[in-house]
Amino acid sequence: MDRKKTLINSSVSNNNSTIKGLQLFIADLRSAQQAQEQEKRIQSEIVKIKQHFDAAKKKQGNHDRLGGYQRKKYVAKLAYIYITSNTTKLNEILFGLEQTVELLKSSIFSEKFIGYMTLELLYERSEVVAKVNDEVNYQLMKDLSSSDDNFVMLALNFVGVVGELTNRLAYNDDITTGVFKILRSPTSSIYLKKKSALSFLALLKSNHSILTEDLQRKQLWIQRILSLLDDTENYRLTLATIPLIEFIAKYIDPSYCTRLLPQLTEILYNCVVVGTSRSSDNQFPLEYTFANMPNPWLITKVVSLLSILIASPTERDSGSLLQTNNIDNELLNKLRKCVSVAIELGTRQAQDPMERIVQNTVLFSLINFASKLDPSDEAISNSVTALCSLLTSKEINIRYLTLDSLVKLCSSSGKPAIDAVRYKNLDMIFHLLNTERDSSIVRKVVDLLYTFTDVENVKIIVDGLLQYILSPKNLAEPQIKSDIAVKIAILTEKYATDINWFVIISLQLLSLTSNTTINDDEIWQRLCQIVVNNPSLHRITCERLVDYLCKKQASEAIIKAAAFLLGEYSSLITDRISSANLFTLFAEKYFSAPNVAKAMILTTMIKLYKTSPEIGSNVIKFFQLELNSLDIELQTRSFEYLNIIQLAKVNGNTDILQILFEPMPPFNSKSNPLLKRLGSLPASAGSTTLINTPSEASSSTPDLLSKRANSSRSIMVPMPPPSRRNTIDDVNSKISSSEDFSGKDSYYSRQILAPNWREGFTRMISHKQGVLFTSSLMKVFYRITTPDAQQPYVFHISLAFINLTEWEITGLSTQIIPSKTQGNPEYLIMNINTPSTATIGPHKRAEQSYEVSIRKPFDVEDSPILAIHFKCGGSTNTINLKTAIGMTTTLISSDVNPSMHLNLAQFISRWKTLSDALGKEGEYQKSGIKLNKDFRKVETISLEDGLLLLTQTVKRLGFDIVDQTSVRSTLFVSGIIHTKSEGNFGCLMKIQYQVNGTVNVTCKTTTAGPLAKYIVECIKNVLTK
């Protein structure tokens, strides 16, 4: 293995001698008994060093009066003073910066090392950077271009450490270019490439524009960086390069990194499957093995990168470019094999604690990644079983990570994972909840229970969580129990099927005293909203609230909820308790309640007076008593209520009371405030919920309880207003999987295209940009580009929607509909971006883009359909356009790749070869193609001019024209069709121009099948109307 001398040894050696003065100085500081003694020693040393440095400035000629050894010693002392003073003595040591820079200029490794090390410590301070930045950059460039690898290594190490501390290095183009040259240079050692990769990552984190400003640089540099992974067995370089590639994929452009899937899969497979195999064929290098696991650091980094590049089947509108249906089956099977082997390793008994930790680390990373691979139900169940077996581990970290992985697995894999947890391991999870003493584990257990709760198990889980809150044996941390109470409230609201149970649980939560949970205003306020909106709950809730008020002690939340609801609906329970008795109950609770609850009780009393004037004397006396309250709010409220009662008596009616205290209208809250308490916790398992977040809500969405409740009346949860969806629906989920007789999706076949769609369709075949559609309302422009010349079968399509009217276009949304989504489709729609805005002002524009990957040949008539939906001038409009993506779109002109150009002899030879090999199987002929209006005038001009127009059209498609004069009326054409899955296909054509203005085309391809027909159809679309 490539070994370098360690920096520690190098830093303390100079011709095999140690810096004794530095060692003595450090020993003196450590032996100081008092801070004053240590400070005195530091100050004396600073004065001494300053004197030596001042004397060095007065050197005569080229004679260095200080010497490298002394300079190194004194700078190292200043660095130690900076460290031991906790960076507080920066201003006292700044005088040494000049001599520190002098060390950088030294040709001795240890001196240069001390210089760089000291500046790495100080460069986080702006005053240091301001003083020496230019000199440091100059010396840094010299060392980066040095022929001594040790000096290059020191410079790279400095860039890697300092690159994220200051933006100045990252914005210095010379330094970034110097680091990149080392990274791409074929003569750089592996050691230097590793350091340069990490240094370049530090620069890139500080300045993304290194790779984003210049497109040519971006393409060239990223491709060079990705090429570092071509050697999949060079694990040392791979380990250092993957973090850089991951950053590029995450923050710069993931489209460049998708081509790495085969290499990454191979690396992961070699480490996890081949490397752990007990077969004699396993030749995995022992130097990369740790705790009987081949390169665990590399495994976790590769999985992290793959997680960015691959989107799981359940992820919608993902920015990832790779879906499981895009990945070759061989690669997908290898990735799945890695997951299954990791599960086997995770369940294997290991005596060594370190080996067990490594096994579990690999297990967690791969199981969290498994949901991206569209796993089978059995694979998901095995993953859950493996994880649950770790819940009994004695190590807190293992239990925590296990629960975290289970939460992610349940939220991403859905029903198979949830069923495996709740049907097989629910008792184990509740046992862990009741016996665990670590608060972080308890939180994760509760999160897991919340994640897989649905209508079937809501009562079991809610009862178990309530028992935990009420049990004195469990953790007494109030915040944990408060969070559990919030989750209980949400679950009962979402999945209650019995209104009695809903009310019982909700009030039981509110009845918990401050000794067991924090009194959350959100819980009782949310309950009041639901009760107000549901008449079926008015009476039953009020009756149970009275029961709680009759108890000697009532919680603050119960008092507040009772004051609010009984003030509104006391008339419904007069057969059980009179208004006078209710007034007495509230009066008893009043003096033990906090001021906020007291204010609510005062309002409740006047509401009771409104429904039962006979209690007026008691109410008036109570208000008069509170006029002397110490709280100004209670004084004011009592005074105002007394005036209202007096005014009502003077008028002889209660109209003013009826107006001021009208019945509470239904709430129309936009969101459940309790959901904010969940943070980033995934949604629970139920597919139908009582509560909908704003993004999920619809005015027509029925609530769950109303469907299942025995009562004819239903709970009506406060619903948000309907939200407009502007996102593009995921193609695979929105389009029906059923197919018609032609193999196309029925949803695709049912689309009715706009009357003028073919004009833009034809233009799109032959031109890379132009007008796709024009109407009185909207004009649509398109542009087709190939992001990567190495992948000519992947196209980036940009669309622009122009509003041609004097009114706003609103509700703009689009849908990209492929002809086929199931059964190995010919092309895939990827990386769909939503329109830049849903509202387009008059004569303004919106933009959108997506990508198409051609996997195998197909007819241009099966191109994707762009469905545009919008409103304008009060009308709702839908425009369906077919976007032309044909086989000719994959052509690369010989101007780009000169090696593709054929002469006449080569053309004739290859034509004969194809005829002998395939006969008529790879051939297609089309005669009598009538030219469109742009060619009709050809009849009146010369043959040469007509052929010239044909030549321009064919070359615009991307074909190469063979230079020849033997057959004047015929064009000899060649090209290469590119596909992702089935490879590349050669194409030869003879295009004969007739005197009557028609064209005959004969096409041969290097494969049997309809490809030749597909190519001719593209040409026919361009030449005809």
Swiss-Prot record:
GO terms for molecular function: clathrin adaptor activity. One of its GO terms (biological process) is intracellular protein transport. The keyword Transport applies. It holds the Pfam family Adaptin_N. It is a peripheral membrane protein. InterPro entries: Adaptor_Complx_Large_Subunit (IPR050840), AP2_complex_asu (IPR017104), ARM-like (IPR011989), ARM-type_fold (IPR016024), Clathrin/coatomer_adapt-like_N (IPR002553), Clathrin_a/b/g-adaptin_app_Ig (IPR008152), Clathrin_app_Ig-like_sf (IPR013041), Coatomer/calthrin_app_sub_C (IPR009028). Keywords: Cell membrane, Coated pit, Endocytosis, Membrane, Phosphoprotein, Protein transport, Transport. SMART domains: Alpha_adaptinC2. Residues 713-737 are annotated as: Disordered. The modification Phosphothreonine is found at residue 727. GO terms for cellular component: AP-2 adaptor complex; cellular bud neck. The modification Phosphoserine is found at residue 733. It is found in: Cell membrane; Membrane, Coated pit. Present with 1590 molecules/cell in log phase SD medium. Adaptor protein complex 2 (AP-2) is a heterotetramer composed of two large adaptins (alpha-type subunit APL3 and beta-type subunit APL1), a medium chain (mu-type subunit APM4) and a small adaptin (sigma-type subunit APS2). PANTHER family: ADAPTIN, ALPHA/GAMMA/EPSILON. Adaptins are components of the adaptor complexes which link clathrin to receptors in coated vesicles. Clathrin-associated protein complexes are believed to interact with the cytoplasmic tails of membrane proteins, leading to their selection and concentration. Alpha adaptin is a subunit of the plasma membrane adaptor. Facilitates interaction between APL1 and APS2. Belongs to the adaptor complexes large subunit family. This is AP-2 complex subunit alpha. It comes from Saccharomyces cerevisiae (strain ATCC 204508 / S288c) (Baker's yeast). The gene is APL3.
